[in-house]
Amino acid sequence: MHPMLNIAVRAARKAGNLIAKNYETPDAVEASQKGSNDFVTNVDKAAEAVIIDTIRKSYPQHTIITEESGELEGTDQDVQWVIDPLDGTTNFIKRLPHFAVSIAVRIKGRTEVAVVYDPMRNELFTATRGQGAQLNGYRLRGSTARDLDGTILATGFPFKAKQYATTYINIVGKLFNECADFRRTGSAALDLAYVAAGRVDGFFEIGLRPWDFAAGELLVREAGGIVSDFTGGHNYMLTGNIVAGNPRVVKAMLANMRDELSDALKR
C-alpha cells in the first residue's frame, strides 16, 4: 500500500467513526449556515481536526486544503492533501444516512491517492494512480454501458449557483429522454465512487469545489472511466463543472448537453 494511502485511510476511518457516533446523538450536533444554502456543523469541524492531526503526525511539512479551513500551507507545496471531512452535510443534518469523508493527495498537480469512506455502510473506496480502484479491498470496474439507453445517471442540483437553474433543468430534460432514470443523493464524493463501482453509469454537476471531487475523480479513472468538463476538456478543476463515466457514456452525455449550455458553462 502507498504510504500516503495508509495515512489517508487511517484519517478517513477516524473521522468516519467520529461522524457515525455523532449521527447517533443528534442533540449534540450544532448546525450553522456559512453561505447561501450551504451549511456546516460542529461535526464537520471536529472531523476535519481529526484528519489534519492524523496527517500532520506523519507529514508535518505537507500542504492541506480543506473545505472548512481553506489552505494550510506547509513547507512542501508540491504535496497537497485535499479534504472534505463530511461530504453530504445537509444529509447528515437531516439524518439521511448518506455522506462520506473524502481525502485526496495531489503531488505536483496530479492526484495520486484517493479515499472516500462511507461510515454508515462501512464502505471504503480507495485508489492509487496506476494501481486501480478498490472497495473494501475488492477491485472496482465501472459500468460497461455502450450508450445512454438503460443507464442510471447521478447528479446534484446547483443549489449554490441557482443562476444556472434553467440551464440545468434543460440539461436534465435532454438526458432524461435518453437514459432510464436519475439519482440525486446529496454527496458528490459518493456519486463518483458509485460511478467507479458501476452502481450508476454516469454523473454530472455544476460548480463543484476541488474537495468535492478530488478523490472521486481518481476513483473513476482507476476504474476505467474518464472525467471531463462540459465541453469534453480538462477545465473542471477550475470551473467545477464535471461529467464522469465510461468513455462512451461521457461522450453521449456531452453530445446531449452541448446545445443546452450557456456561454458561462462552456468554459
Curated annotation (Swiss-Prot):
Instruction: Tell me if Transmembrane helix is a UniProt keyword of this record.
Output: no
- Mind listing the GO molecular function terms for this protein? glycerol-2-phosphatase activity; inositol monophosphate 1-phosphatase activity; inositol monophosphate 3-phosphatase activity; lithium ion binding; magnesium ion binding; rRNA primary transcript binding; transcription antitermination factor activity, RNA binding
What catalytic activity is recorded? Answer: a myo-inositol phosphate + H2O = myo-inositol + phosphate; 1D-myo-inositol 1-phosphate + H2O = myo-inositol + phosphate; 1D-myo-inositol 3-phosphate + H2O = myo-inositol + phosphate
Stimuli inducing this protein: Transcription is autoregulated. Repressed by the Nus factor complex (NusA, NusB, NusE (rpsJ), NusG and SuhB).
Effect recorded for G173V: No growth at 30 degrees Celsius, IMPase activity not inhibited by RNA polymerase (RNAP)
Q: Which Gene3D superfamilies match?
A: 3.40.190.80, Fructose-1,6-Bisphosphatase, subunit A, domain 1 (3.30.540.10)
Q: Name one GO cellular component term.
A: cytosol
**Binding of Mg(2+), residues:** E67, D84, L86
**Protein EC:** 3.1.3.25
* Temperature sensitivity of activity: Optimum temperature is 80 degrees Celsius, 90% of activity remains after heating at 70 degrees Celsius for 5 minutes.
Tell me, according to the record, the phenotype of the null mutant: Conditionally lethal, cells are unable to grow at 30 degrees Celsius and less, grow poorly at 37 degrees Celsius, but do grow at 42 degrees Celsius.
**Binding-site list for substrate:** E67, L86, D87, G88, T89, R183, D212
Its keywords, alphabetically, are:
Chaperone, Cytoplasm, Hydrolase, Magnesium, Metal-binding, Ribosome biogenesis, RNA-binding, Transcription, Transcription antitermination, Transcription regulation
| Stated pH dependence | Optimum pH is 7.8.
Regulation of protein activity: Inhibited by Li(+). Li(+) binds to Asp-84, Asp-87 and Asp-212.
Q: Which NCBIfam families match?
A: PRK10757.1
The protein's assembly and partners = Monomer. A monomer-dimer equilibrium. Homodimer. The rRNA transcription and antitermination complex (rrnTAC) consists of RNA polymerase (RNAP), NusA, NusB, NusE (rpsJ), NusG, SubB, ribosomal protein S4, DNA and precursor rRNA; S4 is more flexible than other subunits. Binds to RNAP, which decreases IMPase activity against 1D-myo-inositol 1-phosphate. Association with rRNA gene-transcribing RNAP is dependent on NusB. Interacts with AR2 domain of NusA; crystallizes as a 2:1 SuhB:NusA heterotrimer.
| Protein family membership | Belongs to the inositol monophosphatase superfamily.
Q: What else is known?
A: E.coli makes very low amounts of myo-inositol-containing phospholipids, so the catalytic necessity for this enzyme is low.
Tell me what this protein is called.
Nus factor SuhB
The organism of origin for this protein: Escherichia coli (strain K12)
Q: Which gene encodes it?
A: suhB
